[in-house]
């Protein structure tokens, strides 16, 4: 089990950080994920290279989503500053490090960040996201669009500062 932890804890911690901003909460979700992984490792079926990491990532994502749903302050349609509903061109991320981009994603409101991670990074459809989060597919699409708009503005602001 120690070898499993040493090999994958960093990757799983990164997944937690994409969904949850508070470091202590990230650690809690990582710990819960590892408990679930250790408890259910006997149900894992090897399906080729990368299947173990994918299986553990899915457990970690599910734990992060359960944590977010349990938060009383988590509302997918929470109070957020108004955003112009314009069509945003792809933001120019040239010159930005992966860490800078991830930091900007972490600064999104929780609902936007969750939908953005599931759609843009995990490759889920808006229908799958809606089912997982208990929202409508149109709400997922709207939140994704707003997340992209906010990220584009963050990138523009950041580039003006450098």
Give the ranges of each region predicted by the language model:
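DNA-recognition helix of helix-turn-helix
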Residues: 65, 121, 127, 131-161
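Internal acidic/polar
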Residues: 66, 73-98
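A short pre-motif secondary-structure segment
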Residues: 115-116
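Sigma70-family region 2
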Residues: 18-21, 34-49, 70-72
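Structural recognition of an alpha-helix C-terminal capping motif at a helix-to-coil junction
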Residues: 14, 28-35, 50-62
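Arg/Lys-rich amphipathic alpha helix in sigma70-family domain 2
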Residues: 43, 47, 57-78
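Short amphipathic alpha-helical boundary/capping segments
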Residues: 100-109
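A short, charge-rich alpha-helical start-of-domain segment used by transcription regulators
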Residues: 1-14, 103
